[in-house]
Swiss-Prot record:
Main location group: cytoplasm
Gene transcribed to yield this protein: hisB
Gene3D superfamilies (UniProt xref): HAD superfamily/HAD-like, Imidazole glycerol phosphate dehydratase, domain 1
Disulfide bonds: none
Chain sites annotated for binding Zn(2+): C93, H95, C101, C103
Organism: Campylobacter jejuni subsp. jejuni serotype O:23/36 (strain 81-176)
Family that this chain belongs to: In the N-terminal section; belongs to the histidinol-phosphatase family.
Protein name per the record: Histidine biosynthesis bifunctional protein HisB
């Protein structure tokens, strides 16, 4: 099974590389690069596995005794393990460049098993390193390379997560032209549907759901808002479903109960068996330019496009607050349900 793998260089990327002799052969020389450990911990929580790939010139020769290397190397691994970080595999080439060996980066001989058996997902794997050879290795593996030094570890984290659990979706009909972009790990928020109150409600999903959300909609508002609201729901639902991918590791279930002067609740299950239970009554026919009857239709269309079972309920006096409560409750339940909390699929059937 293909995995999301980070192929990580060691010296100059994970730990500092001494400029004097380019060897970490004593404990005194062992220093971690800034933010390397917290970044790897966060990426681990998103299901990434780690593989170390390092060139160690002349390892095992009199100029670089293996026992000196291992003292610092084993200490580094012990520290990482104590923080919850372990490498699935460690590959080290001990040769000098002029030996023209088959294993030295950017050649791929050390990773032959990964290539032969397709053990890494090319779309969701990366090479992280500080040298041009690391970037060439990335190209040889068919994955994206992220160059440390040009990017900090925090910037590397953002680059990886922005490309992971993200999706774009476009829906074009004779009635509407809609573009949606979702990043479940957070990001830019920009919503323009031509219906101001609807924009305000969709913004609640982004802000309280902790997701990046960009929506642009050009619809036949000269007729009414029905097609725009319905098609935005369908496009948004399809985009969220696409961003979730195989759903491995997600919590799957979400429940929220925001309470102001009104009480709103939402229960959600990414079961791929769409269903909506909706209990809400409004005094007004419209909130701004949005018909209150379209709120139920929005969530109906959204639940079917997402493939979720959705239960929504609200009680209160103020119609604006009730509508906002429904969208906030949905957002909080969504945030809970899409959170990565394990390495497994949350289903005894093995599929959702």
């Amino acid at each position: 099974m293909s995995q999301k793998i980070l192929f990580i260089d060691r010296d100059g990327t994970l730990i500092e590389e001494p400029k004097s002799d380019f060897q970490i052969d004593t404990l005194e020389k062992l220093r971690f690069e800034k933010d390397a450990i917290p970044t790897l911990l966060k990426l681990k929580n998103f299901g990434f596995k780690f593989v170390m790939v390092s060139n160690q010139d002349g390892l095992g020769t009199p100029s670089f005794p293996k026992e000196n290397f291992e003292i610092a190397h084993e200490k580094m691994l012990d520290i990482l393990k104590s923080c919850g970080i372990e490498f699935q595999d460690i590959f080290i080439c001990p040769h000098f460049e002029n030996e023209n060996c088959a294993c030295r980066k950017p050649k791929t001989a050390m990773l032959e098993e990964y290539i032969k058996h397709e053990l890494y997902d090319k779309e969701q794997s990366f090479v992280i390193g500080d040298r041009e050879s690391d970037m060439i290795l990335a190209s040889n593996l068919g994955v994206r390379g992220l160059r440390y030094g040009e990017l900090s570890w925090k910037e590397i984290e953002n680059e990886i997560l922005s490309s992971f659990r993200s999706a774009s979706y476009q829906r074009t009909t004779k009635e509407t032209d809609i573009k949606v972009k979702v990043c479940l790990n957070g990001g830019k928020i920009s919503i323009k549907t031509g219906i101001d109150f609807f924009d305000h409600m969709l913004e609640q999903i982004a802000v309280h759901g902790g997701i990046g959300l960009e929506i642009s909609c050009k619809g036949d508002l000269e007729i009414d808002e029905h097609h725009s609201v319905e098609d935005v729901a369908l496009a948004l639902g399809a985009c969220i479903k696409k961003a979730l991918g195989d759903k491995i590791g997600i919590a799957r279930y979400g429940f929220a109960l925001p309470m102001d002067e009104c009480l709103a609740s939402c229960a959600m299950d990414f079961c791929n068996r769409p269903h909506l239970v909706y209990k809400a009554k409004f005094k007004k026919s419209h909130l701004g330019a949005l018909s209150t009857e379209m709120i139920e239709h929005f969530f109906y269309s959204l639940s079917y496009a997402m493939g979720v079972s959705l239960h929504l309920k609200v009680k209160g006096k103020n119609d604006h607050h009730k509508a906002e409560g429904l969208f906030k409750a949905f957002a909080k339940a969504l945030k809970m349900a899409v959170k990565i909390e394990s390495e497994n699929l949350a289903s005894s059937k093995g599929v959702i």
